[in-house]
Structure formats: structure tokens, C-alpha cells
Amino acid sequence: MAHPEQHYLDLLAQVLARGDRRVDRTGVGTLSLFGAMLRFDLSKGAAPILTTKKVYWKTAVKEMLWFLTGGTNIRPLLQQNVRIWTDWPLAAYRRATGEEIGQAEFEARIVADEGFAARWGDLGPVYGKQWRRWLGPDGREHDQIAGLIETLRTNPASRRMLFHAWNVAEVGQMALPPCHMVYQYHVTSDGRLNALLYQRSVDLLLGAPFNFVGAAALQLMIAQQADLLPGELVWVGGDTHLYLNHLEQAREQISRAPRDWPRMQLVRRAESIDDYRIEDFAVEGYESHPAIAAEVAV
């Protein structure tokens, strides 16, 4: 049986071989395939943390925990040394002010100055806002995560167990429209929680490895809250692409042999979905190839 990571490497190879060359929003350009699927079995504790390059799994989990707070400002992320969202507010600040501020200085000002952070560190109504505080037409806010967990507990055969972040009325106010858009859940007859993540847009080299980890961590948390066991994580990509400045890095990654996947587990039972911390996650046996550097396209 093929190593589960091999399917990801095969997808990289397919994009390199058959991808449609396109000019994209960022101006960098991509090779793109439309429609992809990967399946990861979480039932035995293995976690989809890629081994053919180093993936900073704690950063991905911290991002997921931040989403669950409903927050939209990068300041709490930077306070935990998570810098993956800085590029968008930094670019907005430079455009608005004309100041050629460096990333490190911008981040330091966000952390040190709450007022500056409030003005320049907010991303608009992105993931957390939609997941936890979706604004209805009557002015009421809807907590999609709480509703999902309640349905898992009370009606696990439901086919309506999902949440999403594509709020048409607010997409234009977001620093970046949601890429990992829809999360749907399914409970098997033997009490396992399956998840399906649909991404409309997939940065296959940089973004997808983080999305795999974040979705798996979320699945563990939701399963625990609903007294279920983790099952399968199904990942579906829409526009699945490699940026043209990532092609050599993709070839380097494909050349590497996957190693055994690590195990991820929760070390305590949290009282609620809002009570998880990064210290609750333990990853054992993660031995990866070296990191592969690549620039984010903004």
C-alpha cells in the first residue's frame, strides 16, 4: 500500500505535468488543475503532517485555535510568534500610507501598540467571524461551530452538519476571501467522525500542508467534544495550483521519500470547544526532511 503522503506528492507531480498555465490575481502566475481529492485515515492516530519537508505543525494548530476564538486581528497570532497572516495587512498599510516599513517593524508595532493593531492589524470578517459570529439579516449572530457540535451530540445521522465562511455579503470586506471554505462532518455507525474539507483555492506547496494539519486538529477537537472517535479526513481542492515561483521547490519535494507519519493526540479533555490550548496537542514521532523555503504570493 502506498504511503498516504505519496498521494500528495503525486498531486504535485500532476500539477507540474498537466497544470494549465494561468495569470492569477497576485501577478505571479500559476500552473493549475481543477478538482482534486486526498483522503487521510486518522482512526489509528496518524496525523497528515507532511514529512517530505518540515511542516511547523504548532503554527497550523495555533492558527486553527485562533479561528475558533472568532478573532480577526493578527495581534494574538503575533503574540504567539505566528506570522502567516502578516503579509495582507502589511501590504494594505504600505498602500495606504506609502511607508516602506519592514515586516519585522510592522509586526513589532502591532504587538506593542493596541491602537495601531486595531487600525492596521484587522483582516476584516474572515474565518473566525463567520464560523462563530455569522451575522443574519435580522441582526442576530449565529455560532456555526456550537451548532455543529450540538447536532453531532443530538442528531449524528444528520446530513446538515457543516459550517462555511463564504458570506457573500461580507467577502468584499475580507483581506482575503476564504480558501478553505466548507467543512462537513459525518458520523459512522460505529461512532467515528469523518470530515470533508472543500477548498476553492489551493496553494499546493505552502497552504495545503497547513490546511491538512489544521483540519485534522479541528477534527480531533470536535470528535472529543461530541464523544466520538476520529475517522477519515477527506480533502477536496477546487483550483489546485502551484505558483510559478514554487516549481523548483515542488520538484525538490517530489524527489524525497516520505517517512512514517507522526501521531497527534489530545492530552486532556477540554470543557468546551473554546477551552483548547496549544499545550493540549501532542505530536509524537515526527521526523521530516528539511524545510523548503518559498515566498507567499499576496
Swiss-Prot record:
It is found in: Cytoplasm. GO terms for biological process: dTMP biosynthetic process; dTTP biosynthetic process; methylation. The active site is at C179 (nucleophile). Pathway: Pyrimidine metabolism; dTTP biosynthesis. The keyword Cytoplasm applies. Keywords: Cytoplasm, Methyltransferase, Nucleotide biosynthesis, Transferase. It catalyses: dUMP + (6R)-5,10-methylene-5,6,7,8-tetrahydrofolate = 7,8-dihydrofolate + dTMP. GO terms for cellular component: cytosol. Its EC number is 2.1.1.45. PANTHER family: THYMIDYLATE SYNTHASE 1. This is Thymidylate synthase. It comes from Cereibacter sphaeroides (strain ATCC 17025 / ATH 2.4.3) (Rhodobacter sphaeroides).
